[in-house]
Design a protein with these regions (language model features):
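Catalytic DNA-binding helix-loop module of base-excision-repair DNA glycosylases/AP lyases
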Residues: 40-43, 94-100, 108-154, 161-167, ...
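Alpha-helix N-cap/helix-start motif
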Residues: 52, 139-143, 161, 177, ...
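N-terminal polyanion-binding entry modules of DNA glycosylases/AP lyases
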Residues: 1-111, 175-176, 183-241
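Ferredoxin-type iron-sulfur electron-transfer modules in oxidoreductases and energy-metabolism complexes
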Residues: 170
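Amphipathic alpha-helical protein-protein interaction surfaces
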Residues: 48, 122, 135, 139, ...
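Alpha-helix N-capping/helix-start residues
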Residues: 74-75, 124, 144, 174
């Protein structure tokens, strides 16, 4: 797996050094700590990274912590996060989450995935993002990029992000988990795009099923129609170093 992750970074740096993902930017900036990453992940759904980062910075310039956001008026929050998709729904959701963090956890975001997924709008991907970017705990957040690229490479053969997460957890040594989301997301945004992936410059194409089987040239989908029982290909038997 290290070879794949390093190859992705080498490819991106050779083509054009990628912009940090919104969550990595929040992690580096330490804007509001773990709570900002929790809120930022909720806001990031169906939103461009640059918009997410700007909105989160503006939001935490106004509301510094869970208690302040919990007491915010919905229309004021809507006004701040308007540049992102579904801002009305998300405004209500993040205020609800702020109230839970403030009242049930004393303002501190829990580091337990079961407690995180019990919050409004927080699924496994969001919870795993919090574990990785807020607490640097090993987890594999699977979004559309991680799901697509994992299937294209032939690491897994799955239908849903949930299946992909479970398959990758069995396949990849835990020491590599922290790098997967950040690297795969940047690679999916810049190189291994949903349409017209840049296979010609990809330094890991020799290990890519999508490229080696000719699916990239034929314009085929990233995942074959047939799927063996269990949600993962025989590739899941490979032990990565």
């Amino acid at each position: 797996m290290k070879k794949i992750l390093d190859g992705m970074m080498s490819t991106m740096n050779a083509v054009k050094p990628p912009r940090m993902t919104a969550l990595r930017e929040l992690h580096e900036a330490e804007t509001g700590g773990p709570f900002s990453i929790l809120i930022g992940t909720i806001l990031s759904a169906r939103t461009k990274d640059e918009n997410t980062a700007k909105v989160v910075r503006a939001l935490f310039a106004r509301y510094r912590d869970a208690r302040e956001l919990a007491g915010a008026k919905i229309r004021d929050v809507e006004r701040i996060i308007r540049p992102i998709g579904f801002y009305r729904v998300k405004a209500r959701r993040i205020i609800e989450v702020a109230k839970i963090v403030d009242s049930e956890y004393g303002g501190a975001v829990p580091e337990d995935i079961d407690k995180l997924v019990g919050m409004p709008g927080v699924g496994r991907k969001t919870a795993n993002c919090v574990l990785v970017y807020a607490f640097e705990k090993p987890a594999i957040p699977v979004d559309i990029h991680v799901h697509r690229i994992s299937n294209r490479l032939g690491l897994v053969e799955t239908k849903t992000p949930e299946e992909t997460e479970q398959a990758l957890m069995k396949l990849v040594p835990k020491r590599h988990w922290l790098r997967i989301n950040d690297t795969f997301v940047m690679y999916g945004q810049n190189i291994c795009k949903p349409v017209s992936p840049m296979c010609g410059v990809c330094q890991i194409r020799a290990d890519c099923r999508f490229y080696q089987t000719g699916m990239a040239a034929s314009g085929s989908s990233s995942r074959p129609a047939s799927r063996p029982r269990g949600g993962a290909t025989a590739a899941t038997k490979v032990k990565f170093s």
